[in-house]
């Protein structure tokens, strides 16, 4: 079976594990994009520590869950967004103003929409978390 979207799979795995009440989850296959998304989620307090475990294949991320995620998902298609248009996308994907984050892939790396707005740069929407 082919895995079409590893990021969407990882985020749904995290969301489902949170709902069941698990304290940690193993995400595979690992990728740089998933690692950067986990870093942003950790920065905003949605997850605890995470680490990369090399299993001789693609690798695995071990993620500590804190029980703070209501929903996390990948945004498909990866919409391009300009620096001044973040509010429109917040209304579409987040339940309330300043509640949750959009994760954006920019020319300066993966970051939240709040950081990208402060820096005045656009990018592509890849995920949301609240």
From Swiss-Prot:
Residue ranges of coiled coil: none
Family note: Belongs to the universal ribosomal protein uS8 family.
Organism: Pyrococcus abyssi (strain GE5 / Orsay)
Any one cellular-component term (Gene Ontology): ribonucleoprotein complex
Functional summary from the UniProt entry: One of the primary rRNA binding proteins, it binds directly to 16S rRNA central domain where it helps coordinate assembly of the platform of the 30S subunit.
Quaternary structure note: Part of the 30S ribosomal subunit.
Top-level taxon of origin: Archaea
InterPro entries hit by this protein: Ribosomal_uS8 (IPR000630), Ribosomal_uS8_CS (IPR047863), Ribosomal_uS8_sf (IPR035987)
GO BP of this protein: translation
Protein name per its UniProtKB record: Small ribosomal subunit protein uS8
NCBIfam families linked to this entry: PRK04034.1
Pfam assignment, any one: Ribosomal_S8
Gene that this sequence comes from: rps8
């Amino acid at each position: 079976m082919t895995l079409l979207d590893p990021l969407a799979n990882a985020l749904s795995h995290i969301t489902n594990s949170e709902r069941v009440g698990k304290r940690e989850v193993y995400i595979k296959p690992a990728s740089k994009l998933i690692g950067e998304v986990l870093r942003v989620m950790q920065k905003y307090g949605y997850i605890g520590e995470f680490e990369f475990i090399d299993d001789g294949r693609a690798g695995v991320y071990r993620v500590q869950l804190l029980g703070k995620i209501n929903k996390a998902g990948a945004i498909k298609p990866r919409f391009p967004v300009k620096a001044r248009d973040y509010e429109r996308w917040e209304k579409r994907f987040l339940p309330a103003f300043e509640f949750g984050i959009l994760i954006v892939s920019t020319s300066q790396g993966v970051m939240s929409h709040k950081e990208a707005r402060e820096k005045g740069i656009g990018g592509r929407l890849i995920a949301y978390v609240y």
